[in-house]
Amino acid sequence: IGPNGAGKTTAFNMLTGVYRPTDGGIRLDGQNLIGKKPHEICKLGVARTFQNIRLFSQLSVLDNVKTGLHNQITYSFAESMFHLGSYRKKEKQMDEKAMELLRVFNLDGVADYKAANLPYGKQRKLEIARALATNPKLLLLDEPAAGMNPNETEELMETIEIVRKRFG
């Protein structure tokens, strides 16, 4: 929380490996994050949303959340190509986990809709659900209410409180 131009997004970009600080260090649970790639930092437990919504607009709501779960995949490329081994079981588990998150955000009823077809406020909630799917230790919300009307903002605040209580 801070005024425009205070450097919030720049700080988020440094925390998530988009920018590299010129001096100092960034640690999470004693591990240095400097020099790590964004996907490596995500695996270490840092997730974020953006000022401008960045969803996969042509994917379903469910599939958008599942993209956040892919850092936890344990099956091989061959298993995924040919639906062998643990692929079906793991995909079913990902579907269940994604639906659980969608229920938290009251998006389970639109799981099969394209993300692009959701109202703006629901797209924001979907972006947060996808970030939570990575199972983060630290969740960074960059201007989460930007562009929302007062009703959407109030609903988002209530949802964030539910997330705080449920996911700590």
Model region roles, listed by residue range:
Residues 1-168:
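Glycine-rich phosphate-binding loops of nucleotide-dependent enzymes
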